[in-house]
């Protein structure tokens, strides 16, 4: 169930940290410490540095977030 007062932004994973934590660089230039949501963990979705992800931020602490979705990278055939 999605909460109403969350801020959702897109960013790129810059660093992988222990305990399923990641440093994410958001599109507006801010750095955020983010952990993986339960659905991503349960479905064994791998997140690597360089992946584009959606992050939910709490309005109370904008330095921490939760990775809710890994966006697909566009592949070019050529």
UniProtKB/Swiss-Prot annotation:
Similarity annotation: Belongs to the IF-1 family.
Keyword Plastid assigned: yes
Protein name: Translation initiation factor IF-1, chloroplastic
Main location: plastid
Domain of life of the native organism: Eukaryota
General function of this protein: One of the essential components for the initiation of protein synthesis. Stabilizes the binding of IF-2 and IF-3 on the 30S subunit to which N-formylmethionyl-tRNA(fMet) subsequently binds. Helps modulate mRNA selection, yielding the 30S pre-initiation complex (PIC). Upon addition of the 50S ribosomal subunit IF-1, IF-2 and IF-3 are released leaving the mature 70S translation initiation complex.
Domain S1-like: 1-72
Record lineage: Eukaryota, Viridiplantae, Streptophyta, Coleochaetophyceae, Coleochaetales
One GO MF term: ribosome binding
Cellular compartment(s): Plastid, Chloroplast
Subunit (UniProt): Component of the 30S ribosomal translation pre-initiation complex which assembles on the 30S ribosome in the order IF-2 and IF-3, IF-1 and N-formylmethionyl-tRNA(fMet); mRNA recruitment can occur at any time during PIC assembly.
GO cellular component, one term: cytosol
Keyword terms, alphabetized: Chloroplast, Initiation factor, Plastid, Protein biosynthesis, RNA-binding, rRNA-binding
Organism: Chaetosphaeridium globosum
CDD domains xrefs: S1_IF1
């Amino acid at each position: 169930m999605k909460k109403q007062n969350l801020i959702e932004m897109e960013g790129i994973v810059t660093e992988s940290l222990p305990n399923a934590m990641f440093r994410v660089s958001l599109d507006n230039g801010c750095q955020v410490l983010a952990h993986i949501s339960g659905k991503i963990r349960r479905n064994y979705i791998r997140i690597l540095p360089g992946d584009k992800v959606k992050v939910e931020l709490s309005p109370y602490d904008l330095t921490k977030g939760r990775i809710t979705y890994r966006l697909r990278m566009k592949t070019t055939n050529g």
